[in-house]
């Protein structure tokens, strides 16, 4: 059976020795399979490899059939989100970090080679991860790479004071909130910051978005799951003379003032992730997050 993916990119976490060693091992293995390999610029610079083809993330997205991302979940988030902005290139995650919730292939040498071989032959399962985009006060000038989130868009207090939000969904008034902020999360992000704030876990294939209050000053404030086709308008009120911060996937902070409006909706692009054929999302929930474990 011929390989389905012939031009393979490797993207690793910068300045991490164990990742660089894994990249070198991967390169040798893929070369043995007769595949064409391109390594991301910074990733290649961290290795001892010479005379290898290198490229930026944008070039990789446009030139390669598949990208292998080596590192932790944070590195996977950053790389896969940027790759998806430029093409529909599928991504494979190899865990060399701590949790490994998104990077689902273990770095064990023999098992990894077998798993990679099967996936590159096309014997895999696929998850399509939706993303969110935002704009402030209808300003469309923000750089694309700084306005798209794979996990969540969060509006939080920049100082130790609660602040107020007024939320509209599809042009209809939904609720007011005073507290430490609000998280608007994708299904992928529902197991990250949103879960820590008390939000529900959403299946990655669910066409939903969840709004999760952060430390709301109310006994009846609860997370809200809505269609990912909805448009969310969030207004910063003047309560407590606020200065709040908008962040995407924990990065690219934007300072917000009273009366500014943040509009959030589903992005056109999705991240395509390849797993082994027997991948089970619920296994990952149990093994990585201790979900639904019997205590006695």
UniProtKB/Swiss-Prot annotation:
NAD(+) binds at residues 73-74, 78, 151-152, 178, 180, 191-196. It is an enzyme of class 2 (transferase). Gene3D superfamilies: Probable inorganic polyphosphate/atp-NAD kinase, domain 1, Probable inorganic polyphosphate/atp-NAD kinase, domain 2. The active site is at residue 73. Pfam families: NAD_kinase, NAD_kinase_C. GO terms for cellular component: cytoplasm. One of its GO terms (biological process) is NADP biosynthetic process. The keyword NADP applies. It is found in: Cytoplasm. Its cofactor is a divalent metal cation. Keywords: ATP-binding, Cytoplasm, Kinase, NAD, NADP, Nucleotide-binding, Transferase. The keyword Kinase applies. InterPro entries: ATP-NAD_kinase_N, ATP-NAD_kinase_PpnK-typ_C, NAD/diacylglycerol_kinase_sf, NADK. It catalyses: NAD(+) + ATP = ADP + NADP(+) + H(+). One of its GO terms (molecular function) is NAD+ kinase activity. Its EC number is 2.7.1.23. Involved in the regulation of the intracellular balance of NAD and NADP, and is a key enzyme in the biosynthesis of NADP. Catalyzes specifically the phosphorylation on 2'-hydroxyl of the adenosine moiety of NAD to yield NADP. Belongs to the NAD kinase family. This is NAD kinase.
């Amino acid at each position: 059976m011929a390989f389905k993916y012939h031009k393979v990119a490797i993207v690793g976490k910068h300045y991490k020795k164990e990742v660089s060693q894994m990249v070198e091992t991967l390169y040798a293995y893929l070369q043995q399979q007769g595949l064409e390999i391109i390594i991301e610029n910074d990733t290649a610079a961290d290795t001892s490899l010479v005379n290898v083809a290198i490229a930026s993330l944008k070039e990789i997205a446009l030139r390669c059939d598949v990208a292998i991302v080596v590192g932790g979940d944070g590195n996977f988030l950053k790389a896969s989100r940027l790759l998806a902005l430029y093409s529909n290139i599928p991504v494979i995650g190899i865990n060399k970090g701590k949790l490994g919730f998104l990077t689902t292939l273990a770095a064990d040498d023999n098992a990894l080679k077998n798993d990679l071989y099967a996936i590159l032959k096309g014997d895999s399962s696929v998850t399509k991860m939706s993303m969110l985009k935002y704009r402030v006060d209808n300003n469309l000038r923000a750089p694309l790479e700084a306005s798209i989130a794979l996990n969540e868009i969060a509006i939080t207090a920049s100082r130790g004071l609660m602040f107020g939000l007024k939320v509209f969904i599809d042009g209809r008034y939904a609720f007011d909130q005073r507290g430490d902020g609000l998280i608007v999360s994708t299904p992928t992000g529902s197991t990250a910051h949103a879960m820590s704030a008390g939000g529900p876990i959403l299946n990655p294939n669910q066409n939903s978005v969840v709004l999760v209050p952060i430390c709301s000053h109310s006994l009846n404030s609860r997370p809200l799951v809505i269609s990912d086709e909805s448009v969310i308008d969030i207004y910063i009120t003047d309560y407590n003379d606020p200065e709040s911060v908008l962040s995407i996937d924990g990065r690219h902070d934007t300072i917000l003032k009273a009366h500014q409006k943040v509009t959030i909706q589903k992005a056109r692009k999705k991240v395509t992730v390849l797993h082994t054929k027997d991948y089970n999302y619920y296994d990952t929930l149990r093994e990585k997050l201790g979900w639904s474990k019997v205590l006695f």
